């Protein structure tokens, strides 16, 4: 599962909103497929510009991500690096493109079900559900850190108090 962070949550939410509001969608088009919509949000490139960059590599986003090399500055590699900076791994990119992350599917409203990668409504619900799941994970991490910090502070104070007696 992707690393929970505000940037990724916002990208998923904005991409879902764009799709809901009628943005062009075509699963077979690098610039207007699932990852293409995330890239439109984070890069501010349009679908045509993303397609031009993506055509410097071969395959779908899944293959491009697997072959990604951070050293080259090929246009497709720059796009994959944007996705990785959001907290996505090649597996996450594959799951976004194919709507296959089991954690997201189990978190769907109404429970687990398979979604179709090329159905706009399925992409919207997947993006929104993934954003909600990441938001919950991020919230849990923040609460856990605060709790650990509080417990550490309390134990430090108790130790200091014990030395006085």
Where are these regions (language model features)?
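Cysteine-nucleophile amide-bond enzymes
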Residues: 1-29, 33-36, 40-165
């Amino acid at each position: 599962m992707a690393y929970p962070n505000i940037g990724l949550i916002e990208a998923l939410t904005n991409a879902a909103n764009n799709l809901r509001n009628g943005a062009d969608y075509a699963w077979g088009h690098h610039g207007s497929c699932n990852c293409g919509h995330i890239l439109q949000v984070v890069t501010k490139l349009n679908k045509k510009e993303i397609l031009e960059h993506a055509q410097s590599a071969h395959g779908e986003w899944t293959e491009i991500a697997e072959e990604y090399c951070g050293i080259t500055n090929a246009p497709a590699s720059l796009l994959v690096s944007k996705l990785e900076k959001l907290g996505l791994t090649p597996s996450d990119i594959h799951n976004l493109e194919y709507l296959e992350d089991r954690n997201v599917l189990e978190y769907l409203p109404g429970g687990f079900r398979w979604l179709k990668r090329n159905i706009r409504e399925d992409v919207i619900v997947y993006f929104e559900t993934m954003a909600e799941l990441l938001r919950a994970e991020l919230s849990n991490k923040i609460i856990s850190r605060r709790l650990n910090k509080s417990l550490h502070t309390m134990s430090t104070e108790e130790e200091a108090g014990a030395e006085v007696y």
